[in-house]
């Protein structure tokens, strides 16, 4: 996991190359690349977006030139149009920053010797939230559906619902 100015970035690095979960801000793309490059000689092959917020997707236009971007269909829809989050307006991302693979409920990527399962959990933090399960490593990346030490921000303006976020947490504890 890489940590920085935005959300945490999950990394799978190995013989197949590199997969990252979320990519933070475009001005940080070179620093993000410098952090994962020593982990594998292979290329960046996948970027998984856990939701559409700028601190998780705004380096997509940089990394989308070399890797497949994968996200829930609502993430692509929201990144394709002007959006508002906490009073800030964000312009649509250019084509190279949009997810090219989308899903409605779940998608699996078989990469670096394990199944990486991406599951949409509707209406928690936003209406495009996904949780990423690294099945062999027994690791979960929850995007902004989990905040260490405090309750997550629920973006009701963009489809988030407190009760659904609670339901997600409850389902993962089983």
Annotate the PLM regions:
Residues 28, 32, 59, 75-78, ...:
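Stable alpha-helical elements in mature extracytoplasmic
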Residues 28, 52-58, 76-79, 126-129, ...:
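Active-site environment of divalent metal-dependent phosphoester hydrolases
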Residues 21-23, 45-53, 70-74, 121, ...:
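Active-site neighborhood of phospho(di)ester-bond hydrolases with catalytic His/Asp-centered motifs
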Residues 23, 27, 149-174:
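Cap/insert and terminal regions of metallo-dependent hydrolase folds
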Residues 1-35, 130-144:
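Conserved beta-strand hairpin/beta-sheet module of binuclear metal-dependent hydrolase folds
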Residues 15-19, 27-70:
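Active-site metal-binding motif and surrounding structural segment of the metallo-beta-lactamase
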Residues 12, 22, 36, 51, ...:
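Divalent metal-coordination and catalytic microenvironments
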Residues 75-121, 126-127, 135-136, 167:
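Metallo-beta-lactamase
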